[in-house]
Regions:
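Hydrophobic alpha-helical segments at protein termini of multi-pass membrane proteins
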Residues: 1-167
Length: 167
């Protein structure tokens, strides 16, 4: 994930600040974050193979990795918004991240876990599970990019009502 970030960050310098921010949110963040979380799920699969029995386990493990990531990221966002903008800013950040989208990272990483769980159910070895893991990772990255992009390019609340709430 760090390598992806190192490659993508300099490329953003070629864009104007507004476009660079949008690309960072819609392209860079989903790739970097989902690869990092996906590696966590893959490590659970490789080293906890006896407890990784199928798609439901994959969803649960992926969701837990995503929840841990979201918890950590939210603490960082809350602290930064409090320092930079005070009570009003941290309140806005809390509503946006803590109430409107607490399960976004959970949902994205669960997709990666589901793909690995299906591979387990089919009897895949860790080596054979690499392609299903990549497929799940692509799904997670796409959902994350769609989610972040909705705040930049589309109607965030329409996506929230049609995708986030039902899931």
């Amino acid at each position: 994930a760090l390598l992806v970030d190192i490659v993508l960050s300099p490329a953003l310098a070629f864009f104007d600040p507004v476009s660079a921010d949008a690309l960072s949110s819609v392209v860079q963040a989903p790739i970097v974050e989902e690869v990092a979380k996906g590696l966590g799920v893959l490590l659970l699969f490789v080293f906890g193979r006896r407890a990784f029995d199928g798609p439901v386990d994959g969803v649960v493990y992926g969701a837990l990795v995503g929840a841990g990531f979201a918890f950590t990221e939210n603490i960082l966002y809350f602290a930064t918004s409090l320092i930079d903008g005070g009570v009003g800013e941290v309140t806005f950040t809390f509503v946006l991240r803590g109430i409107l989208s607490p399960f976004a990272h959970v949902m994205f990483t669960a997709v990666t876990g589901f793909a690995l769980g299906r591979a387990v159910r089919r009897g895949a070895t860790p080596g054979e599970a690499l392609w299903p893991w990549i497929a799940g990772l692509i799904g997670a990255i796409a959902l994350h990019a769609l989610w972040n992009g909705s705040a930049v390019f589309a109607d965030f609340f329409a996506l929230y009502v049609t995708l986030q709430m039902p899931l």
